[in-house]
Amino acid sequence: MSPVRFAGRLMGLMGRRIARRPIFCGLTSHEGEKHMNGVVLMVVAAVVLAAGYLGYGRWLANKWGVDREALTPACRMEDGHNFSPASAFTAFSHQFSSICGAGPVTGTIVAMAFGWLPVVLWVLVGGIFFGAVHDFGALYASMKNNGKSLAQLIDKYIGRTGRRLFLLFCWLFCLIVIAAFTSMVSGTFAMTPDASGAVDVAKSYAAGCAGTISILFTFVAMVFGWACRKFNLTGAKQFVTGVVLMVAMFAVGMQFPVYLDLNGWIAVVMVYLVFAGAMPIQMLKQPRDYLTSIMMIVMIVCAVLGIVVLGAKGQATITAPMFTGFTTASGMMFPVLFVSVACGALSGFHSLVSSGTSSKQVENEADAVKVGYGAMVVESFVGVLAIIVAGIMFSDMNTAGTGALNAGVASTPFAIFATGIARGMQAFGVDGTVATVFMTMNVSALALTSLDAVARIGRTSFSEFFATSNDALAVENEKTGVMKVLGNPWVATVVTLLPGLALTFGGYLNIWPLFGASNQLLGGMTMITLAVFCKCTGRSGWMLYAPVAFLLVCTFTSLGMSIAGCVTALQAGGMAVMATSGLQLVFAVLLVALGLIVAVNCLKELRGKESGSMPDEEPEWSEVGRRNCSAHQAAAADGAPEGLAAEA
């Protein structure tokens, strides 16, 4: 499947009225209107985001007391499965590749219905003061609590009931994402049949090549991870090895495309997810994320070079409208824009990655700001690039002055993004076929890396729900009661994937329209939990209060509008719309109830807890951690195991 077909599937999930119209339907570029140069906007955005990272990000790290001398959970609690210390770039690559899914491209371009200026402003302001703070905060709070997940933090600071409700929400959230992204990724690789039902090689070549590369990715990643551990490949050696392997995989994939239908690829993706979700993280997920990040960095570089080259040719003018009004065909700017943009500015899903997997890999506490805050800033830059590419292509997609789409031109977010970057790559000499295959692979990678992260998070959420312990290291080692079976990584992964597989064949479409609101509700619950964490540990948390208030108001407004819309639809359509509007109504009401319960409990804790009443947890150690940490490091660390200090 080409990037255009992939985007068509993606837009089918959006569930908003704008998803059933051309992206820029109703938007016109008026004669005499001044236009922004894409190169200028790109440079300004890069400077603003870099300043945010160097200024606000580092200030926040100092404010919260990041300690580069402290031994992290990844080192102290290394267990050969979930806790695995990694270099700063490796940990960054895991975080970045896991969070940078479809959102920063799809959400930003869809939101351009309100004009490119409000979207850019929200991406920059939201990325620096909301999203990056959210991601870094979740990562840091987890690290200061022995790698606890967000649900376990809620248990500690708010209560066991809040934890159970949150875990149920997370697991159901993961099922929806697994279903949607499995459908999208499989559709990306699926072959296109001709009239007789045979493979149409001309139309299926790029998808087949990308499929081959993706299959090779899994096996090469495991070999790469083994080689890095065996031969101690770090820094430049590790990066160069990764680049060489990527080039080799790409060359092989171009020569040996694999042609399977949609169901065949769904089976392949599901088998991969079983291993990605259950295997020790350093064996598959960690090295695959490293290689994926190399590819995504190359994509970003290609996008930047393409915009610069087009700018040199006078073809980088953003012709899309700067502002179209506070109300468009897709609804009111508040809350639609802020719910739609999601990953480009803030996404609640990121907190599950930060606290669920990344906190167990960061080797040095000082790297937390690079991994948590830095990855989000880079993702915001990807969102800005998507806006620029779409803005430049606006005049090509629309018949001048009419807002009607020209025939045969990309008209969906990923198609716009992929086509625009491919054009830019051709502008500086890359072969068109190579550019198409490269972008097809990137389009699928954006979804696949988030998909395997969700599979792993869904598995851990399932196990944590039944666990009696609130200890991150003890959950999978708990062998009492149902945890003898449900605590097993392979069992929990399969149990999580089976309902996701069932939903893949259409059921998820009925509730997908609420994904944006549920994602931001998760972000709001994360931020308010972080506010409680800061107060309980005596840290300054005032910078979280405004984001918390904004997110909760925005989310509940969006859900309230959805509930009203569902009620109206049910009154008009009756039983005929029960499977869609009825299910959405039930899900929306449950989300509101869950959000209110968690928010009210958090507010009670904020008002009732004394500052500094619950200091950071005493460091925990695993047997592997004891062996691997040097006697000097352990003796110098606060809470070093008894006997180790004496040995030093």
Regions found by a protein language model. Give the residues of each.
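A generic transmembrane alpha-helix motif of multi-pass inner-membrane proteins
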Residues: 36-52, 245-282, 286-292, 302-309, ...
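Transmembrane helix-loop junctions in multi-pass membrane proteins
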Residues: 37, 104-105, 117, 176-200, ...
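Extracellular loop-to-transmembrane helix junctions
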Residues: 37-54, 58, 111-142, 151, ...
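Membrane-interface "cap" regions at the ends of multi-pass membrane proteins
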Residues: 51-105, 293, 332, 336
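Flexible loop linkers connecting adjacent transmembrane helices
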Residues: 58-84, 110, 120, 124, ...
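Membrane-interface helix-loop-helix modules in multi-pass membrane proteins
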Residues: 84-145, 156-160, 177-193, 370-397, ...
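Loop-to-transmembrane helix boundary motifs in multi-pass membrane proteins
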Residues: 160-175, 374-380, 435, 464-506, ...
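Extracellular/periplasmic helix-exit of transmembrane alpha-helices
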Residues: 307-325, 377-419
